[in-house]
Amino acid sequence: MQLGFAMLADPILLITILLGFAMAWAIGANDAANSMSTAVGAGAITPRQAVIIAGVLEFMGAYFFGKTVTETIRKGIIDPSKITDPNVLIFGSIAALIGATIWLVIATKYGLPVSTTHSIIGGIVGYGIVYGGMSIVNWDKMIKVVLSWILSPIVGAIFAYLVFRALSKTVLQSKDPVKSAKRWSPFWIGLAFVVIGTMFYIKVLHGNSLLEGFLKYGMPAGILTFIVVSLILEKRFPATDPYLGAERVFRRVQVITSAYVALAHGANDVANAIGPVAAVYTVAMFGLAGAKVPVPRWILALGGLGIAIGVATYGYKVMETVGKKITELTNTRGFTIDFSAATVVLIASWLGMPISTTHTVVGAVIGVGLARGIKAINKDIVKDIIISWFVTVPAAGVIAGIIFKALMMLMG
């Protein structure tokens, strides 16, 4: 449906559209910046190249692969059956957007990578408690969210630590690095593309069968990549220094893995910005309220554009934190982080475990750093990041609760 005069004449809907765009911008500045942080930190691409690539792919992911039906209340975190008044859903959505956006802007200002999903959940819980008390919150779901704070970075760190140790042993520290790099690099890169292909089916195309994704996309992508990389390395190893040669092999691949992360992020996390907009749009235009609502393409475009602009204008702060401040990254370390984070998220999706991509990426960065010893980690930065994770839900919730209360009193 096109943006008509009647729609634009509705001030509440117009405000919600602007807030949704602001939230999308904040997602781009914070969460989307994660997709390119390791590539920038390892020197695979420049920050300018990173924001262009991330911006284009985030928009493509949101517009072409974003879900056309979204939840009005993310993750079923509060009971929608207890919200019978459409005005509550409208003002609650506005309050949740404001709460989440303000917190994301604060976190981004200090270069802290936080979860946008947790931010919008915090906003929803905040207005939900103000409206219906503690009983309106689905505490079983909330416990799963809290568990994801703990599980995501730990699992990401352990997996990345083990992968990097294995990669170092097979490629970087062998007796004949050139021979080992030619033999093992295609294996590791092919394995990464098995995960990427399968994840593309699950996360971007929103498929339900992990086995189908593995057979249709993952396995063919992995085998093809293995063959291509093997042929290239057999003909020409890209350096006289074997260590630098191995790093250059993984540099090219790291750009591809980071680009995939950006595409998948746009497809998935755009819902955090446009879900509340779609809810208000449906109520305003059709007088309908429900647990799920259709999402017009123009709303997906709005979200994708906001994310792209957010990456381009303010994404450098979080990129710098994740890519440079936690630990020193090389191309093999950056590849390990992307591969580990994607694999952990894929396995978690298969098992139905709650997991945060942001927390997993940061955990993987820490794990790679720990593989070189505890002194390789900037402990002060890690401490600040962990504190920000635990503050995210309550901070967004308190802001949203105050905004919701003020709106309800104002509109009487």
From Swiss-Prot:
InterPro entries: Phos_transporter. It is found in: Cell membrane. One of its GO terms (biological process) is phosphate ion transmembrane transport. GO terms for cellular component: plasma membrane. It is a multi-pass membrane protein. One of its GO terms (molecular function) is phosphate transmembrane transporter activity. It comes from the Archaea. The chain crosses the membrane at residues 7-27, 50-70, 88-108, 119-139, 143-163, 187-207, 213-233, 298-318, 335-355, 384-404. Keywords: Cell membrane, Membrane, Phosphate transport, Transmembrane, Transmembrane helix, Transport. Belongs to the inorganic phosphate transporter (PiT) (TC 2.A.20) family. Potential transporter for phosphate. This is Putative phosphate permease PF1020. It comes from Pyrococcus furiosus (strain ATCC 43587 / DSM 3638 / JCM 8422 / Vc1).
